[in-house]
């Protein structure tokens, strides 16, 4: 979902962080805390990871402070630092909410729509929930679309190429395969091609 955020938001700093091949959460921590990458502590990396996922799910400073066990003011600074680091993410969030207000719906990269009839609600709690969905549903929905497309392609190849290995489970962005040991290398190459 973070890679999708980079793609959909077009945020250059986020795209560059992924293209560099470095640990994205550590790279985010280095930017937020203004540190050289090797100086980022494991604790700072964990905080950045929580921020990376939490912010795209619409976490508040209160929620982030609770998750990380830090003061609310520090969590607020972390969120603000994140949004300064990745300004395209903030722009995407604002644009997604505005477009959803107009359309009362959002779409995945493959065109699947999620209706958001409460996006213009007068009730702030109800509206806030719809706004968070306006930001997150295109990301989570697109990730779901992409993994399902990969699963279909892999299932076809498992059958057409006469693998004995079986795809048995999907968990978020991972596929679990019961692998026949003699097929491991060929299967790994095929899965990489399809994903």
Regions found by a protein language model. Give the residues of each.
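Conserved catalytic core of nucleotide polymerization and phosphodiester-bond processing enzymes
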Residues: 1-195
């Amino acid at each position: 979902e973070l890679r999708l955020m980079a793609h959909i938001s077009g945020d250059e700093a986020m795209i560059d962080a992924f293209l560099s091949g470095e640990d994205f959460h550590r790279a985010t921590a280095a930017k937020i805390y203004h540190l050289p990458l090797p100086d980022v502590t494991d604790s700072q990396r964990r905080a950045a990871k929580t921020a990376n996922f939490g912010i795209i799910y619409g976490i508040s400073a209160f929620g982030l402070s609770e998750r990380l066990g830090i003061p609310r003011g520090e969590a607020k600074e972390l969120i603000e630092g994140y949004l300064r680091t990745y300004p395209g993410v903030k722009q995407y969030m604002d644009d997604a909410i505005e477009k959803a207000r107009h359309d009362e719906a959002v779409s995945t990269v493959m065109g699947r729509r999620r209706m958001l009839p409460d996006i213009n609600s007068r009730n702030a709690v109800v509206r806030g929930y719809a706004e968070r969905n306006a930001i997150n549903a295109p990301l989570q929905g697109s990730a779901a679309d992409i993994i399902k497309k990969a699963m279909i392609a892999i299932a076809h190849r498992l059958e057409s190429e006469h693998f004995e290995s079986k795809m048995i489970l999907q968990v978020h962005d991972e596929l679990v395969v019961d692998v026949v040991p003699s097929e491991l290398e060929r299967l790994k190459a095929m899965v990489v091609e399809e994903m």
